[in-house]
Amino acid sequence: MRMLPDFFTGNWDDMFQGLLETEYVFDFPEPSEASEEMSLHDLFDVEVDGFEEDANQEAVDGMFPERLLSEAESAAESGSGDSGVGEELLPVDLDLKCYEDGLPPSDPETDEATEAEEEAAMPTYVNENENELVLDCPENPGRGCRACDFHRGTSGNPEAMCALCYMRLTGHCIYSPISDAEGESESGSPEDTDFPHPLTATPPHGIVRTIPCRVSCRRRPAVECIEDLLEEDPTDEPLNLSLKRPKCS
Protein backbone atom coordinates (compact mmCIF):
# COMPACT_ATOMS: atom_id res chain seq x y z
CA MET A 1 0.00 0.00 0.00
CA ARG A 2 2.95 2.33 0.53
CA MET A 3 3.87 2.04 -3.18
CA LEU A 4 0.43 3.13 -4.46
CA PRO A 5 -0.26 6.76 -5.34
CA ASP A 6 -2.14 8.94 -2.97
CA PHE A 7 -5.37 9.06 -5.01
CA PHE A 8 -5.80 5.25 -4.84
CA THR A 9 -5.86 5.24 -1.02
CA GLY A 10 -8.96 7.42 -0.64
CA ASN A 11 -12.63 6.84 -1.41
CA TRP A 12 -14.13 6.46 -4.92
CA ASP A 13 -14.87 10.16 -5.34
CA ASP A 14 -11.32 11.10 -4.54
CA MET A 15 -9.99 8.37 -6.87
CA PHE A 16 -12.16 9.56 -9.78
CA GLN A 17 -11.20 13.19 -9.19
CA GLY A 18 -7.55 12.18 -9.11
CA LEU A 19 -7.85 10.35 -12.44
CA LEU A 20 -9.38 13.42 -14.05
CA GLU A 21 -6.60 15.66 -12.78
CA THR A 22 -3.83 13.30 -13.85
CA GLU A 23 -2.22 14.53 -17.06
CA TYR A 24 -0.53 11.38 -18.36
CA VAL A 25 -3.71 9.27 -18.30
CA PHE A 26 -5.56 11.24 -21.00
CA ASP A 27 -2.52 12.70 -22.68
CA PHE A 28 -3.21 11.55 -26.27
CA PRO A 29 -0.92 12.80 -29.02
CA GLU A 30 -2.49 15.35 -31.30
CA PRO A 31 -2.71 14.31 -34.96
CA SER A 32 -0.25 16.00 -37.21
CA GLU A 33 -1.28 18.27 -40.01
CA ALA A 34 0.22 15.99 -42.65
CA SER A 35 -1.93 13.00 -41.58
CA GLU A 36 -5.10 15.10 -41.75
CA GLU A 37 -4.39 16.31 -45.25
CA MET A 38 -3.37 12.90 -46.69
CA SER A 39 -6.15 10.63 -47.94
CA LEU A 40 -6.17 6.98 -48.96
CA HIS A 41 -6.13 7.92 -52.64
CA ASP A 42 -3.09 10.14 -52.07
CA LEU A 43 -1.28 7.35 -50.27
CA PHE A 44 -2.06 4.93 -53.09
CA ASP A 45 -0.75 7.27 -55.80
CA VAL A 46 2.41 8.33 -54.00
CA GLU A 47 5.25 8.84 -56.46
CA VAL A 48 8.56 7.64 -55.11
CA ASP A 49 11.46 9.89 -55.99
CA GLY A 50 14.81 8.41 -56.81
CA PHE A 51 13.69 5.63 -59.22
CA GLU A 52 13.57 7.15 -62.65
CA GLU A 53 13.38 3.87 -64.58
CA ASP A 54 11.17 0.99 -63.50
CA ALA A 55 11.60 -2.46 -65.01
CA ASN A 56 7.90 -3.29 -64.58
CA GLN A 57 6.56 -0.03 -65.94
CA GLU A 58 5.81 -1.42 -69.41
CA ALA A 59 4.05 -4.49 -68.02
CA VAL A 60 1.88 -2.37 -65.73
CA ASP A 61 1.01 0.04 -68.53
CA GLY A 62 0.06 -2.92 -70.74
CA MET A 63 -2.31 -4.30 -68.12
CA PHE A 64 -3.90 -0.91 -67.37
CA PRO A 65 -3.67 1.30 -70.47
CA GLU A 66 -4.19 5.01 -70.04
CA ARG A 67 -7.14 4.98 -72.42
CA LEU A 68 -9.14 2.65 -70.16
CA LEU A 69 -8.23 4.63 -67.06
CA SER A 70 -9.26 7.89 -68.68
CA GLU A 71 -12.56 6.42 -69.84
CA ALA A 72 -13.25 5.08 -66.35
CA GLU A 73 -12.53 8.46 -64.79
CA SER A 74 -14.72 10.27 -67.33
CA ALA A 75 -17.56 7.83 -66.72
CA ALA A 76 -17.24 8.32 -62.96
CA GLU A 77 -17.25 12.10 -63.31
CA SER A 78 -20.26 12.07 -65.64
CA GLY A 79 -22.13 9.67 -63.35
CA SER A 80 -21.55 11.88 -60.31
CA GLY A 81 -22.92 15.00 -62.10
CA ASP A 82 -26.24 16.70 -61.48
CA SER A 83 -27.91 15.29 -64.58
CA GLY A 84 -27.34 11.67 -63.50
CA VAL A 85 -26.90 10.52 -67.10
CA GLY A 86 -23.38 9.40 -68.04
CA GLU A 87 -21.76 9.59 -71.41
CA GLU A 88 -21.79 6.56 -73.66
CA LEU A 89 -18.69 4.41 -73.41
CA LEU A 90 -16.71 3.80 -76.53
CA PRO A 91 -16.45 0.20 -77.77
CA VAL A 92 -13.16 -1.49 -76.98
CA ASP A 93 -11.71 -4.31 -79.05
CA LEU A 94 -10.59 -7.04 -76.66
CA ASP A 95 -8.54 -10.02 -77.73
CA LEU A 96 -10.41 -13.05 -76.37
CA LYS A 97 -8.31 -15.63 -78.14
CA CYS A 98 -6.67 -18.29 -75.97
CA TYR A 99 -2.95 -18.60 -76.62
CA GLU A 100 -2.38 -21.56 -74.26
CA ASP A 101 -1.31 -24.92 -75.62
CA GLY A 102 -4.04 -27.54 -75.58
CA LEU A 103 -3.81 -31.31 -75.44
CA PRO A 104 -1.11 -32.91 -77.56
CA PRO A 105 -2.27 -34.34 -80.89
CA SER A 106 -3.16 -38.01 -80.93
CA ASP A 107 -0.85 -40.67 -82.25
CA PRO A 108 -1.55 -41.66 -85.89
CA GLU A 109 -1.23 -45.33 -84.94
CA THR A 110 -4.06 -44.92 -82.45
CA ASP A 111 -6.24 -43.29 -85.10
CA GLU A 112 -5.61 -46.17 -87.49
CA ALA A 113 -6.50 -48.71 -84.79
CA THR A 114 -9.77 -46.97 -83.98
CA GLU A 115 -10.69 -46.73 -87.66
CA ALA A 116 -10.01 -50.45 -88.09
CA GLU A 117 -12.23 -51.27 -85.10
CA GLU A 118 -15.03 -49.12 -86.47
CA GLU A 119 -14.82 -50.78 -89.87
CA ALA A 120 -14.92 -54.24 -88.25
CA ALA A 121 -17.99 -53.30 -86.23
CA MET A 122 -19.92 -51.84 -89.17
CA PRO A 123 -21.24 -55.16 -90.58
CA THR A 124 -22.82 -56.10 -87.24
CA TYR A 125 -24.44 -52.71 -86.82
CA VAL A 126 -27.97 -52.24 -88.15
CA ASN A 127 -29.34 -48.81 -88.76
CA GLU A 128 -32.92 -48.83 -87.54
CA ASN A 129 -33.85 -45.89 -89.74
CA GLU A 130 -32.87 -47.78 -92.90
CA ASN A 131 -34.13 -51.22 -91.81
CA GLU A 132 -37.22 -50.74 -89.67
CA LEU A 133 -39.23 -53.52 -88.07
CA VAL A 134 -42.30 -54.19 -90.22
CA LEU A 135 -44.82 -56.87 -89.29
CA ASP A 136 -45.36 -59.35 -92.08
CA CYS A 137 -47.46 -62.48 -92.55
CA PRO A 138 -46.14 -64.54 -95.47
CA GLU A 139 -47.74 -67.74 -96.70
CA ASN A 140 -44.92 -69.87 -95.30
CA PRO A 141 -43.92 -68.79 -91.78
CA GLY A 142 -40.26 -67.86 -91.49
CA ARG A 143 -39.69 -67.56 -95.26
CA GLY A 144 -39.78 -64.20 -97.00
CA CYS A 145 -40.89 -62.45 -93.80
CA ARG A 146 -39.55 -58.91 -93.37
CA ALA A 147 -39.87 -59.09 -89.58
CA CYS A 148 -37.80 -62.30 -89.52
CA ASP A 149 -35.17 -60.68 -91.76
CA PHE A 150 -34.97 -57.73 -89.37
CA HIS A 151 -34.38 -59.98 -86.34
CA ARG A 152 -31.83 -62.07 -88.24
CA GLY A 153 -29.88 -58.99 -89.29
CA THR A 154 -30.00 -57.50 -85.79
CA SER A 155 -29.07 -60.62 -83.83
CA GLY A 156 -26.84 -62.26 -86.42
CA ASN A 157 -28.69 -65.57 -86.01
CA PRO A 158 -29.80 -66.89 -89.42
CA GLU A 159 -32.43 -69.10 -87.75
CA ALA A 160 -34.12 -66.30 -85.81
CA MET A 161 -37.86 -65.83 -86.34
CA CYS A 162 -40.37 -63.21 -85.41
CA ALA A 163 -43.02 -63.92 -82.79
CA LEU A 164 -45.86 -64.18 -85.32
CA CYS A 165 -44.11 -66.81 -87.46
CA TYR A 166 -43.07 -68.74 -84.37
CA MET A 167 -46.65 -68.83 -83.08
CA ARG A 168 -47.95 -69.92 -86.48
CA LEU A 169 -45.48 -72.80 -86.57
CA THR A 170 -46.03 -73.98 -83.00
CA GLY A 171 -49.61 -72.84 -82.43
CA HIS A 172 -51.09 -76.35 -82.66
CA CYS A 173 -48.99 -77.40 -79.67
CA ILE A 174 -50.45 -74.63 -77.55
CA TYR A 175 -54.06 -74.09 -78.55
CA SER A 176 -55.17 -77.63 -79.42
CA PRO A 177 -57.16 -79.25 -76.59
CA ILE A 178 -55.77 -82.71 -77.47
CA SER A 179 -52.52 -83.49 -79.20
CA ASP A 180 -52.63 -85.21 -82.57
CA ALA A 181 -52.66 -89.00 -82.50
CA GLU A 182 -49.24 -90.45 -83.23
CA GLY A 183 -50.55 -93.92 -84.03
CA GLU A 184 -51.14 -96.98 -81.91
CA SER A 185 -48.29 -99.05 -80.59
CA GLU A 186 -47.49 -102.54 -81.80
CA SER A 187 -49.30 -104.15 -78.88
CA GLY A 188 -52.45 -102.20 -79.68
CA SER A 189 -53.27 -101.39 -76.07
CA PRO A 190 -54.28 -97.77 -75.45
CA GLU A 191 -52.30 -97.70 -72.18
CA ASP A 192 -48.98 -97.83 -74.05
CA THR A 193 -49.71 -94.73 -76.09
CA ASP A 194 -48.21 -91.41 -75.04
CA PHE A 195 -51.02 -89.14 -76.19
CA PRO A 196 -53.74 -88.31 -73.62
CA HIS A 197 -57.09 -90.02 -73.47
CA PRO A 198 -60.04 -88.44 -75.29
CA LEU A 199 -62.36 -86.25 -73.32
CA THR A 200 -65.50 -88.23 -72.38
CA ALA A 201 -68.31 -87.91 -69.88
CA THR A 202 -67.03 -90.80 -67.76
CA PRO A 203 -63.49 -90.37 -66.41
CA PRO A 204 -61.01 -93.23 -66.79
CA HIS A 205 -60.48 -95.78 -64.05
CA GLY A 206 -58.56 -94.47 -61.06
CA ILE A 207 -59.46 -90.82 -61.54
CA VAL A 208 -61.84 -89.30 -58.99
CA ARG A 209 -64.24 -86.77 -60.41
CA THR A 210 -64.41 -83.59 -58.41
CA ILE A 211 -67.79 -82.74 -56.91
CA PRO A 212 -68.66 -79.06 -56.59
CA CYS A 213 -69.65 -78.00 -53.08
CA ARG A 214 -71.76 -75.00 -52.29
CA VAL A 215 -70.39 -72.78 -49.59
CA SER A 216 -72.78 -72.30 -46.68
CA CYS A 217 -73.56 -68.72 -45.82
CA ARG A 218 -75.41 -69.23 -42.52
CA ARG A 219 -74.04 -67.55 -39.44
CA ARG A 220 -72.26 -69.38 -36.68
CA PRO A 221 -74.28 -69.63 -33.43
CA ALA A 222 -73.15 -67.59 -30.49
CA VAL A 223 -70.93 -69.34 -27.97
CA GLU A 224 -69.91 -68.55 -24.44
CA CYS A 225 -66.25 -69.44 -24.84
CA ILE A 226 -63.85 -70.35 -27.59
CA GLU A 227 -63.71 -74.01 -26.54
CA ASP A 228 -67.32 -74.41 -27.69
CA LEU A 229 -66.22 -73.83 -31.26
CA LEU A 230 -63.94 -76.87 -31.11
CA GLU A 231 -66.77 -79.17 -30.03
CA GLU A 232 -69.09 -80.54 -32.67
CA ASP A 233 -72.76 -79.66 -32.37
CA PRO A 234 -74.78 -82.92 -32.55
CA THR A 235 -78.06 -81.18 -33.20
CA ASP A 236 -76.73 -78.92 -35.94
CA GLU A 237 -79.76 -76.71 -35.67
CA PRO A 238 -79.97 -73.47 -37.63
CA LEU A 239 -79.53 -70.22 -35.83
CA ASN A 240 -82.73 -68.70 -34.51
CA LEU A 241 -82.47 -64.97 -34.98
CA SER A 242 -85.60 -64.29 -32.92
CA LEU A 243 -83.83 -65.29 -29.71
CA LYS A 244 -81.54 -62.96 -27.85
CA ARG A 245 -77.88 -63.73 -27.57
CA PRO A 246 -77.03 -65.11 -24.14
CA LYS A 247 -74.97 -62.82 -21.97
CA CYS A 248 -71.53 -64.01 -21.04
CA SER A 249 -70.98 -64.17 -17.30
Curated annotation (Swiss-Prot):
Motif (PXDLS motif, CTBP-binding): 238-242
Region (Disordered): 180-203
Region feature (Interaction with RB1 in competition with E2F1): 38-46
GO molecular function per UniProt: zinc ion binding
Source organism of this protein record: Human adenovirus F serotype 40 (HAdV-40)
Residue segments, region Interaction with UBE2I: 74-131
Motif (LXCXE motif, interaction with host RB1 and TMEM173/STING): 96-100
Oligomer and partners: Interacts with host UBE2I; this interaction interferes with polySUMOylation. Interacts with host RB1; this interaction induces the aberrant dissociation of RB1-E2F1 complex thereby disrupting the activity of RB1 and activating E2F1-regulated genes. Interacts with host ATF7; the interaction enhances ATF7-mediated viral transactivation activity which requires the zinc binding domains of both proteins.
GO process annotations (BP): regulation of DNA-templated transcription; symbiont-mediated perturbation of host cell cycle G1/S transition checkpoint; symbiont-mediated perturbation of host ubiquitin-like protein modification; symbiont-mediated suppression of host innate immune response; symbiont-mediated suppression of host JAK-STAT cascade via inhibition of STAT1 activity; symbiont-mediated suppression of host type I interferon-mediated signaling pathway
Keywords for the protein's UniProt record, in alphabetical order: Activator, Early protein, G1/S host cell cycle checkpoint dysregulation by virus, Host nucleus, Host-virus interaction, Inhibition of host innate immune response by virus, Inhibition of host interferon signaling pathway by virus, Inhibition of host STAT1 by virus, Interferon antiviral system evasion, Metal-binding, Modulation of host cell cycle by virus, Modulation of host E3 ubiquitin ligases by virus, Modulation of host ubiquitin pathway by virus, Oncogene, Transcription, Transcription regulation, Viral immunoevasion, Zinc, Zinc-finger
Feature: compositional bias, Acidic residues: 181-193
Subcellular location: Host nucleus
Family: Belongs to the adenoviridae E1A protein family.
One Pfam family per UniProt: Adeno_E1A
This protein's GO CC annotations: host cell nucleus
Name of the molecule in the record: Early E1A protein
Zinc finger residue extent: unnamed: 145-165
Role this protein plays: Plays a role in viral genome replication by driving entry of quiescent cells into the cell cycle. Stimulation of progression from G1 to S phase allows the virus to efficiently use the cellular DNA replicating machinery to achieve viral genome replication. E1A protein has both transforming and trans-activating activities. Induces the disassembly of the E2F1 transcription factor from RB1 by direct competition for the same binding site on RB1, with subsequent transcriptional activation of E2F1-regulated S-phase genes and of the E2 region of the adenoviral genome.
Motif stretch (Nuclear localization signal): 244-248
